[in-house]
């Protein structure tokens, strides 16, 4: 992996402390290295590795992952089977943030327009 990037299972990772929106962070990752994107996480071990990197780099360990709009395929239905013909959703897309605490790691959704740190990943 290049200087300042860390290797894990054939991929290179780097946590950035700059605060960016999800879209700006994704663009920033893309510009860093060929194939680089916001990180996807595929196992508890990979999550722990990224969490350790974040703990070493960030004061507040909250960062964008590559997951966005996780519910866009969701089909909403009324419990009484009535037709969904009226909606007043707040039309804000959501993206995934990973938070690292001393005793656990968790993900939550956050408005993509918010600014947080982020982690990039590419296949080496």
Swiss-Prot record:
Keyword Transcription: no
Residue ranges of domain C-type lectin in the record: 8-121
A GO molecular function held by the record: toxin activity
Location in the cell: Secreted
Domain of life: Eukaryota
One Gene Ontology term, aspect cellular component: extracellular region
Sorted UniProt keywords: Disulfide bond, Hemostasis impairing toxin, Platelet aggregation inhibiting toxin, Secreted, Toxin
Expression sites (tissue/organ): Expressed by the venom gland.
Cysteine pairings via disulfide bonds: 1-12, 29-120, 95-112
Signal sequence region: none
Subunit text: Heterotetramer of subunit alpha, beta, gamma and delta; only the gamma and the delta subunits are disulfide-linked. Alpha-beta heterodimer and gamma-delta heterodimer associate orthogonally, giving a cruciform conformation. This heterotetramer may covalently dimerizes thanks to the gamma subunit.
Record function comment: Potent inhibitor of collagen-induced platelet aggregation. It acts by binding to the integrin alpha2A domain and blocks collagen binding to integrin alpha-2/beta-1 (ITGA2/ITGB1). The gamma/delta subunits mainly contribute to this activity.
Family affiliation: Belongs to the snaclec family.
Name of the protein: Snaclec rhodocetin subunit delta
Native organism: Calloselasma rhodostoma
Lineage, broadest ranks: Eukaryota, Metazoa, Chordata, Craniata, Vertebrata
